[in-house]
Amino acid sequence: MRCLLLVALLLAGSLCAMAQFHLGIRSGFSAPYYTHYSEGKDLNGVKVESRYSSSAIVGIHGGAFGLYEVPIVDEFSLEGEGGVQFSRLGGSVAGVTTSLYYMQFPMRANAVYKLGELGSAGPASILASIGPQIGIGLGGSMNQYTVEWGEGGMNRLNVDLSFHLGMRFSRIPLQGTVFYELGLTSYGGSKHESNTLNNVGISVAYLFF
């Protein structure tokens, strides 16, 4: 038992010694939309369900993040990512545009594979990441009406699961990704309906190596 504990401590120490921490800034554009689901009964008591997705609106995001990189082998490493960003989400249905502004806190696990030299761009890597994202509602509107949060209004807390796929360059420390965010919580509605926020877009980051 003591030997196993010693091996675990040595392994953890070696990983910490190899680990690297990086900071970065990120911004981008997206096409956020929401998915509506409701259920009820018709006049005959038969269950009726309704599901639709809104049209997308123009979304933006920007913020800062940190990466904790642990090399596994020369060509492959794992990263833990955390950060904070401002985002515009929402959607549009039948002329009613919902714009919601959130402060988001992403937490993702990244897998990075080094491709080697990529012409004049220098060393490049491909990356894939997945993780939850917690958002706190700051404000918003439905056409000209201001959104109200809390009881009788919209839910201020939003949670989604985000997926990123992209490339990273070392000579010019830039990272570009495409992403999809799947809403897990409803931002508003009665107990028989839900409205979940989804998002798809592109993001560009600058890394301070």
Where are each of the predicted segments found?
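Short glycine/proline- and aromatic-enriched beta-strand/turn motifs that initiate or cap beta-hairpins
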Residues: 19-67, 207-209
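Predominantly the C-terminal beta-signal and adjacent terminal strand-loop region
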Residues: 22, 33-41, 75-79, 85-87, ...
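Outer-membrane beta-barrel translocator domains and adjoining extracellular loop/strand segments
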Residues: 35-44, 91-98, 121, 140-148, ...
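Bacterial Sec-dependent N-terminal signal peptides
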Residues: 1-26, 204
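Surface-exposed loop and membrane-interface regions of Gram-negative outer-membrane beta-barrel proteins
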Residues: 48-53, 80-100
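Short loop/turn motifs that connect adjacent beta-strands in outer-membrane beta-barrel proteins
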Residues: 19-21, 71-78, 115-125, 172
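Residues on the lipid-exposed face of transmembrane beta-strands in outer-membrane beta-barrel proteins
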Residues: 25-31, 60-68, 84, 107-113, ...
